[in-house]
From Swiss-Prot:
Organism: Ureaplasma urealyticum serovar 10 (strain ATCC 33699 / Western)
Domain of life the protein comes from: Bacteria
Functional note: This is one of the proteins that bind and probably mediate the attachment of the 5S RNA into the large ribosomal subunit, where it forms part of the central protuberance.
Any one Gene Ontology molecular-function term assigned to this protein's record: structural constituent of ribosome
Parts forming coiled coils: none
Pfam family, one: Ribosomal_L18p
GO cellular component annotations of the record: cytosolic large ribosomal subunit
Keywords, in A-Z order: Ribonucleoprotein, Ribosomal protein, RNA-binding, rRNA-binding
Record's protein name: Large ribosomal subunit protein uL18
GN (gene name): rplR
Family stated for the protein in its record: Belongs to the universal ribosomal protein uL18 family.
GO BP terms: translation
Gene3D superfamilies: 3.30.420.100
SUPFAM superfamilies: Translational machinery components
NCBIfam families to which the protein is assigned, alphabetical: L18_bact
Length: 121
């Protein structure tokens, strides 16, 4: 059988699609909001989304907090901020969705800060 060569971008897109379906199915079954992380080279965003109601419950980003970039220190601030907003609305347990990115660097820093602030995932 002929081996198919996928580009790195195509592989990442397929992996992200698989993970999105898996996370969404888990969230619908568990009735928990999803903490969705999005990052670029310059900034990092975190949103708390309820897929059952299709609404964003809370959001935080390095842009909203007027931080100059999305480095690890600023990712920690975003993680603590989103956790504070989630706890204020009564959500202690969430499902973590990193959008196919590796759990490393800024993603890990944001997740650790959210856990330290009281979120469970």
């Amino acid at each position: 059988m002929k081996r198919i060569n996928f580009s790195r971008a195509k592989q990442r897109a397929l992996r992200a699609k698989r993970l999105h379906v898996k996370i969404r199915n888990l969230q619908l079954a568990a009735n928990k909001p999803v903490l969705v992380i999005t990052k670029t080279n310059a900034h990092i965003w975190a949103q708390l989304i309820c897929y059952n109601k299709n609404i964003t419950l809370a959001s935080s980003s390095s842009v909203q907090l007027d931080l100059q970039n999305g480095n690890k220190d600023n990712a920690r601030l975003v993680g603590a901020d989103i956790a504070k907003k989630a706890l204020a609305q009564g959500f202690k347990q969430v499902i973590f969705n990193k959008n196919g990115a590796k759990y490393h660097g800024r993603i890990k820093a944001l997740a650790d800060a959210a856990r330290e602030a009281g979120l469970e995932f």
